Amino acid sequence: GAYICGDETALIKSLEGERGQPWSKPPFPAIEGLYSKPTVVNNTETLANVPPILMNGADWYRTMGTEQSTGPKIMCLSGHIKNPGNYEIIMGDMTYRDLLFGEDYGGGILGDKELKAILPVGGSGPMITPEALDAPITYEGLKPFGSDMGSGSVVILDETVDVVWAARKMAKFFEHESCGKCTPCREGTFWMYHLLERIEAGNGSEEDVKTLVSVAEQIKGKTLCALGEFAVSPVVGTFKHFANEYQLKVTGK
């Protein structure tokens, strides 16, 4: 199904042959899910951890990682990185610096350019800057920097990237993937994309930037599923760290 089917209730609707749209909970899938039967929905990585836990026991599994982030984790590196790919790590045993620059992992920034920013959850989470490189790779490690590890889909942006361009690309994705069921997400993603398109083209104003941030804030906490929350991340994250680039687009200075 579509990206929206990352929401468990939308996935269930898709499996039933209906349009992949989330429903308002309750009822929760564990009570009333697929064909109105109790349903447990987990992702593939979670299910892959079940057999070794059954074979070796929960205590064995808890010897890996931290108290809050237990076990191994598959991290995906993409973007401006020398060695893109999937890497299995033990949570808490390494930092983002180790992951990006370690010879057995990312190997450094492509073309030996400077690192500008990291999308630790792809477009679905707030951007971080090089100051967070020494944060441990755990679910809690990026909280001091206002972000999180999420699914571990790490996208690297080098010094040449126009962050307004990057935000516009991500906003377009979320506008396209919104199922349209709830108004804040449907209308919010539409306006965020078109405002970013105008700003990136050099036709925006300072008022457009204010409206963009306001629209993003209005989406938060008002959507049926997490897609709407994810959609504001490109705007909030880029504006938090690179407000000067927005200013340059609309004022030329």
Language-model segment annotations:
Residues 108-145, 240:
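Terminal amphipathic helices with adjacent charged low-complexity linkers/tails
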Residues 92-110:
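Short amphipathic, charge-patterned alpha-helical segments
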Residues 70-72, 113, 148-152:
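Short, solvent-exposed loop/turn segments at the edges of secondary structure
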Residues 1-91:
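Hydrophobic alpha-helical positions that pack around
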Residues 4-17, 23-26, 52, 87-89, ...:
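Short acidic, glycine/serine/threonine-rich loops at helix termini
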Residues 136-253:
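Ferredoxin-type iron-sulfur electron-transfer modules in oxidoreductases and energy-metabolism complexes
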